[in-house]
Design a protein with these regions (language model features):
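Metal-dependent phosphohydrolase cores
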Residues: 1-182
């Protein structure tokens, strides 16, 4: 998918925003905040996928509208929830040093990088709306398996330091990129 065709913000494409996050991530690694290559690669995956849910037609209409348009909770799903459908488990599993929960950890960081809703509840209760929102990109998304739910529950319900670090570094990169810091 060409992410230069989709807007993350009125003045920035999704790809430009991802590139900004990756620049911040590289700075964090250079400064010694991220001490392992596998953790760096997992955060990189989270940075890449975190806003891809913004490719939906409704989000693109809103972000490019001349007059402010508000999120329609009856017709739309928050982008952090939609973004998880783009996370490629095979890409995560290719990371040297990964373990079996790393896919769930990356998904956890992506899904919870905003507090717009309860992502799991939204996925379980709004399946039809999710399908509608993702209809035009259905060939780009992945189905969430039962294994995903089991592993996510384990990551979410215990204090999984690796998941917390991935989410924390994603936040640091996203907030500093969005605010043009660093």
């Amino acid at each position: 998918m060409n992410l230069e065709r989709y807007w993350a913000k009125p003045d920035k494409t999704i790809q430009q925003h991802i590139n900004d996050l990756l620049t911040r991530l590289e700075t964090l690694k250079t400064m010694g905040y991220i001490d392992s290559d596998d953790l760096y690669e997992l955060v990189k995956q989270a940075c890449y996928y975190h806003d891809i849910g913004k490719v939906t037609e409704r989000f693109q209409q809103r972000v490019l509208a001349k007059e402010k348009q508000y999120f329609d909770p009856d017709r739309e799903i928050p982008h952090n929830v939609l973004s998880v459908y783009f996370v490629n488990e095979d890409q995560v599993q290719k990371i040297k040093g990964h373990d079996k929960r790393d896919y769930a950890r990356v998904c956890f960081a992506v899904m919870y990088h905003h507090d717009y809703c309860d992502p799991i509840k939204t996925i379980l209760e709004r399946e039809d709306t999710i399908k509608e929102n993702l209809a035009e990109v259905k060939n780009e998304i992945f189905k969430l398996s039962q294994k995903f739910y089991t592993q996510l529950a384990m990551v979410k319900d215990i204090e999984d330091i690796r998941a917390v670090k991935i989410k924390g570094y994603l936040h640091k990169c996203d907030y500093s990129a969005s605010g043009n810091y660093m």
